[in-house]
Amino acid sequence: MQQSAFLELPKNFYELVLPEPQQNARLVTVNHSLMDELNCDLSDKQLLALASGNLTDESLINFNLIPLAQKYTGHQFGYYNPDLGDGRGLLLGQWHDKNNQAWEFHLKGAGRTPFSRRGDGRAVLRSVIREYLASEALHGLGVPTTRALAIASSQEQVQREIFEPRASLIRVTPTHIRFGHFEWAASLGKDALDALIAFVIQHHYPELAELPENEQAGALLKAVCGRTATLMAKWQAVGFNHGVMNSDNMSIIGETFDFGPYAFFDDFQIEYICNHSDVEGRYAYNQQPKIGVWNCQVLAAAFGQSVTEAEQTAALDHFVQTYNQQYVSEMNAKLGLATQQETDKDLIGDLLVLMDKQRVDFSLFFRRLAKLGHADENDLRRLLSQPEEFEPWFERYHQRVAQEALSEDKRQQRILNNNPSIILRNYIAQQIIEAAEVGNFQPLNDWVKALHSPFENHPGLAEFQQPPTPEQKGLQLSCSS
């Protein structure tokens, strides 16, 4: 491993902090698929030391680590908070894969830092398992996301709403820099802002370094807005509600970042709110694209000392254009369509209105749309409380499919390739957590393996490919998760 490149930034961007180790910790799980992708040859003993925070002076030297807590600010539920930073996580260092891509190793649940405020800096088994599951589920679905490498846990109890077992997780991503880092840099002045812009371009957008120097900051802002728009489109298409889209939870490289009270849809509800702390619905499913552009406006304002007003406007326009194009593209793929037409947006929108009205299971509807017009199409119609209301839409869909150059077999295959047979529903995550809390981690490992290939049939998980019971649906969580 190597020391984090983040240390190249001015010292007011971080504090050096050692983790508060877990005592008698065990390695709960290792993401061997990710280990292979990273060409990572760390032993289980080494991973346990990293994941549990048991880093002695010798191990710090051997690993070549200088752990640090990052300082940033951000807008939380629309209000600026200047007192943010890594309150329970530490950037340990970075690993280079065989392509020399640097991957940051970040320890979530590392203990208190100067930015913990009144928190204890710890994480619990429930929350790290939820992050592990969600990041791997999104990765399997083709949605940009941070990843999870390993989990460690111990018998130490941490007080939340109840006492829960302490745990920690190694999060992996090329960078943990958030929109909030730029808000912090802007508050420090133009020199700090320019230093952060130059750092991000050098390490994460190197193609922009070829532009004239006075165009680079504006190009970076535009690129980040574009990636964020693409991410929003993908979230909407897979039925993912993040729940806490504060600007300090927005990745500068357009990845899903910081998993709390998230949810994948059971029944489709356009105004669904997964976070029961979000009483006003600011981060409801249908608000996510709007909040995405709102956060980009915050980012553009933070760039204000280094870009022109015209560059800010161009970046935000780029978000809107990118989102509109990407969203239709993602949804058309779910419908088995290979081309785009002007009427497709209405076809998609009208379908979602029907699904919302009848509370149709989101993932199962699109998966079973492959059966429309076939002997087993009743598997699709059984999802509908009033199938007759869908008939006009089905007719429009048939007409639209007829305009494609795809055979029926290819339409079906395109649908199956773009709609998962299994999805990480909240009740499934809760079952996995409950098993883990009594020492059974097999369901966790089995599900992570399955979530890496969600478009396959998985006959062993057939019971999870049916609509959940009323008791299993709509489980909401709070930010404490």
Curated annotation (Swiss-Prot):
<dbReference type="Pfam" id="PF02696">
    <property type="entry name" value="SelO"/>
</dbReference>
<feature type="region of interest" description="Disordered">
    <location>
        <begin position="458"/>
        <end position="481"/>
    </location>
</feature>
<comment type="similarity">
    <text>Belongs to the SELO family.</text>
</comment>
<keyword id="KW-0067">ATP-binding</keyword>
<feature type="binding site">
    <location>
        <position position="120"/>
    </location>
    <ligand>
        <name>ATP</name>
    </ligand>
</feature>
<keyword id="KW-0479">Metal-binding</keyword>
<feature type="binding site">
    <location>
        <position position="88"/>
    </location>
    <ligand>
        <name>ATP</name>
    </ligand>
</feature>
<keyword id="KW-0464">Manganese</keyword>
<keyword id="KW-0460">Magnesium</keyword>
<feature type="binding site">
    <location>
        <position position="108"/>
    </location>
    <ligand>
        <name>ATP</name>
    </ligand>
</feature>
<feature type="active site" description="Proton acceptor">
    <location>
        <position position="248"/>
    </location>
</feature>
<comment type="function">
    <text>Nucleotidyltransferase involved in the post-translational modification of proteins. It can catalyze the addition of adenosine monophosphate (AMP) or uridine monophosphate (UMP) to a protein, resulting in modifications known as AMPylation and UMPylation.</text>
</comment>
<feature type="binding site">
    <location>
        <position position="178"/>
    </location>
    <ligand>
        <name>ATP</name>
    </ligand>
</feature>
<keyword id="KW-0547">Nucleotide-binding</keyword>
<feature type="binding site">
    <location>
        <position position="121"/>
    </location>
    <ligand>
        <name>ATP</name>
    </ligand>
</feature>
<keyword id="KW-0548">Nucleotidyltransferase</keyword>
<protein>
    <recommendedName>
        <fullName>Protein nucleotidyltransferase YdiU</fullName>
        <ecNumber>2.7.7.-</ecNumber>
        <ecNumber>2.7.7.108</ecNumber>
    </recommendedName>
</protein>
<dbReference type="GO" id="GO:0005524">
    <property type="term" value="F:ATP binding"/>
</dbReference>
<keyword id="KW-0808">Transferase</keyword>
<feature type="binding site">
    <location>
        <position position="87"/>
    </location>
    <ligand>
        <name>ATP</name>
    </ligand>
</feature>
<dbReference type="GO" id="GO:0000287">
    <property type="term" value="F:magnesium ion binding"/>
</dbReference>
<dbReference type="InterPro" id="IPR003846">
    <property type="entry name" value="SelO"/>
</dbReference>
<dbReference type="GO" id="GO:0070733">
    <property type="term" value="F:AMPylase activity"/>
</dbReference>
<feature type="binding site">
    <location>
        <position position="171"/>
    </location>
    <ligand>
        <name>ATP</name>
    </ligand>
</feature>
<feature type="binding site">
    <location>
        <position position="258"/>
    </location>
    <ligand>
        <name>ATP</name>
    </ligand>
</feature>
<feature type="binding site">
    <location>
        <position position="249"/>
    </location>
    <ligand>
        <name>Mg(2+)</name>
    </ligand>
</feature>
<feature type="binding site">
    <location>
        <position position="258"/>
    </location>
    <ligand>
        <name>Mg(2+)</name>
    </ligand>
</feature>
<feature type="binding site">
    <location>
        <position position="85"/>
    </location>
    <ligand>
        <name>ATP</name>
    </ligand>
</feature>
